[in-house]
Regions:
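N-terminal acidic, glycine/proline-rich low-complexity segments
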Residues: 1-120
Length: 120
């Protein structure tokens, strides 16, 4: 089993040139995505002109086929009552994504994937 606690997946956020490439794309699917993000962001503190929200699921999907660019450790973990992911030697061991070795490479990969034509 492989998991990505919030500690490592909370970095799945696009900003700067990566985000602007998505935001300014003429792709109909990305335009629809950005239209929906603009609507959603009205009820939040997010500024849709500047950055995405945290894209938690993108890291989980990435981990479904590779652990490249991630620091992985086989360990037992648990979630405390306060919602903190903590090591637990008595818990079932799993491969845990703890950190990134090259976060910018992931951001570039995610940007490239989103800008790629949809395969039908």
């Amino acid at each position: 089993m492989i998991i990505t606690p919030q500690d490592s997946c909370s970095f799945g956020k696009l900003t700067g040139d990566h985000y602007q490439a998505i935001r300014q794309s003429n792709d109909p699917a990305l335009k629809a995505l950005m239209d929906n993000y603009n609507i959603w962001a009205k009820g939040t503190t997010h500024d849709p002109e500047v950055a995405s929200s945290v894209l938690f699921d993108t890291v989980a999907v990435y981990l479904a086929y590779t652990t490249e660019h991630l620091v992985m450790k086989n360990m037992g973990i648990r979630v405390t009552d306060e919602g903190v992911t903590a090591p637990d030697v008595n818990a079932q061991h799993m491969d845990v994504a703890l950190d990134w070795t090259n976060l910018d490479t992931f951001h570039q990969y995610l940007t490239d994937r989103l800008l790629s034509p949809i395969v039908q």
